Amino acid sequence: MKRVGNCWKASVAAFFLLMFTAFAAADTTSVDTVSYKSNSEFFDGEVLQAGYVSNFATDKINVHLGASEIESKTGATAEEDLTLSVSHQNTYARYPLQETGLKKIYGWEGMKKTFDTKDQLWNWVTSNCADFTEGGVAIGDRTSKVEAAAKSWYDYWTGSYNYQAFCLRKNGYYGDVADIGSPDEIFRTEWRLQAGDKNPQTAIITNGDGGSGVVSNLGRYAKVKWQGNLDTGQNPPLVDDELAIHGNNYEGGWRVISEQRYDNYWNYIKNDGNRLLDKWKSGDYSESYIEGLLNGKAENAQKRYSESPLANAEVLDSSFQSGALKADMDSRLAYPEFNVYVDAGENGYITVSKPVGKPKIVSSSGASFGELSSGRISVDVKNVGGAEGSFSARAGSCSQYFQADALQNTKRVAPGETASYSFRVTFTSTSMQQASYTGRCSITVEDTGSGREVSTSVSVEATQQSECTQGKEIVKQKNGNDVIYSCPDGLKIQKQDTCTGELKAVFVNNDIQYDCREEGTGGGSGGGLFGKRFTLPITGTQLSNPLNAFENIWSGDANALNWLQVFVTFIAFLGGFALVGVKLGKIVDGLATEFIPVKDSHVRLVIGLLGGGMIATAVYQLVTDPLGLLVTVLGLVVMGYLYLSASAPEINL
């Protein structure tokens, strides 16, 4: 746009809502409303909208919109007057002609012939006779797809049978038949637009020309768009008992015929055709009588339907594929709406200008926040224009992972004043690792009066929190070894164990926890007093740590399997304590009394604790594996039996 003083040159669009009726010839000379808006769908810049709603009858529009009237109603300055006239209306109904598979109207010819054999009769009938019932007829033991009558007699002179056939064949046709579709009301008006003493812009506007009838060029600098519902107050003639027949011998290629006479024609042939052939065969009717009867029906069916309101309709399209008829209507248009858009830019047709607000971004700020929270970005906007501005701010696109609120914020800002706008920004990432992300978000500010826009971008930064499933473990490869990580709180992962040597991470505890084991083994737990595994001194053998199950219970992470493992291990400890303390305690007891001054109960206690611990550890290695659990239960039964056997008192009789 070109700046003129403190104003902006712009486009101007005049919007006229027109109403027509058929009962008077008064001219419309003024508009009811005039407003000044931004932009149009056809030209850049501002829009001058003039609306007219008539409350009286009129068949002609002759509007004069003076420069002073434009200024008084909008505050904008126009350098020329604007006039618009609409006249010379023509209204009609357009009826499309549609091919729907209707049969043609045929003429008919009777045929008969005598044959020596049935085969000769059959061949002649199937090659020459017409099918008018879509049923066929039986000839001997065969059924034809055509209609015919036949008779036979014995010729004593030749000593053989003779055969005679009677049938009808089509003898030309009058034309193809089409349905008449629902009508479209078409209007045609002449438009003339002029700014000052410049060359007028003219156009013919009609809703019957498809796209060009909806939006037409009104010269080089203006466009006219019809957008209302056409209503004349009169319905077009109804199509009730009409069809159309197409042929070169009809004026314009089409003729309107009666649907009832057409149906009577075909119903008579289908229902009475075979009866007529039988009458001919029996000698009751002659060939000429039947031909005259059928062709009379055909002639009547193709006659012009003079009683129809479309009998004298003008042919708009003579082709069979897209035929159309035109019926003139006497009434005038009522309530059509028209938009007139006039270019008033730097090189436009009319010049209009108006002081407007002018936004300028004087400061901005970004945001830094964590993933589970949000931040706010903001701008300060100053009105550096000569009039109050209505400034609308909106947050635009952001970098990947960042989203800004889509809400638009509008404020009225006086000249020289500043307004602040802020928008909420959030962050979303699918990453599982903790990291920082940076990006930018755009903010655009528009003066709704002029359409002028200014924009900027601000920085945003967010910290990604590590994410994981609480209680679940994962395995990663590091330096060729499996490293087990756990998720204690659902937000971050931490290192749990490293599987070295031949050990690999395998699932245990219902597939939510891992353990370092040799390939091909399952179950288990490792590291520290409550680690999942511990290593035997000297031998270096790694064993599952029973105390790990107690850790799961104390931490609240135990499941049903953990409880069962602890219960079985505890029973094994009690059984081992009792068995070793009683059975082996007696042996060690004897040795101790010779070399160690300790009471028997102390020795049994120590031996029982050591034995119970070793048996409990061995049992835990088994119960961490489902198959081992079954073997362990059987072992406990055997151990219980041995315990009872060893502790049973001897009874001497």
Swiss-Prot record:
Q: Which residues lie on this side of the membrane: Extracellular?
A: 25-559
Q: Tell where it localizes.
A: Cell surface; Cell membrane
What is the predominant subcellular site recorded for this chain?
Answer: other
Sorted alphabetically, the keyword list is:
Calcium, Cell membrane, Disulfide bond, Membrane, Metal-binding, Signal, Transmembrane, Transmembrane helix
Q: Which residues form the signal peptide?
A: 1-24
Map out region (Fusion loop) in residue numbers: 155-160
Q: InterPro entries, from UniProt?
A: Fsx1
What is any one of the record's Gene Ontology cellular component terms? plasma membrane
Chain ranges sitting on the Cytoplasmic side read 581-604, 647-653
- Looking at the record's lineage, which domain of life comes first? Archaea
Could you tell me which cysteines form disulfide bridges? 129-167, 398-441, 468-487, 499-516
Which Gene Ontology MF annotations are present?
metal ion binding
Q: Name one GO biological process term.
A: plasma membrane fusion
According to its record, how does it sit in the membrane? Answer: Multi-pass membrane protein
- Indicate the family of this protein: Belongs to the HAP2/GCS1 family. Fusexin 1 subfamily.
Subunit note: Homotrimer stabilized by interdomain contacts and numerous Ca(2+) and Na(+) ions.
Domain comment (free text) = The extracellular N-terminus has 4 domains; the first 3 are structurally similar to fusogens from plants, C.elegans and viruses, while the fourth domain is unique to archaea. Domains I and II are discontinuous. The fusion loop in domain II is stabilized by a Ca(2+) ion so that it protrudes from the molecule.
- What does the UniProt function comment say about this protein? Exhibits fusogenic activity. Mediates cell-cell fusion in mammalian cells (bilateral fusion).
Q: What is this protein called?
A: Fusexin 1
Source species, please?
A: Haloplanus natans (strain DSM 17983 / JCM 14081 / CGMCC 1.8972 / RE-101)
Give the lineage. Archaea, Methanobacteriati, Methanobacteriota, Stenosarchaea group, Halobacteria
Which gene underlies this protein? fsx1
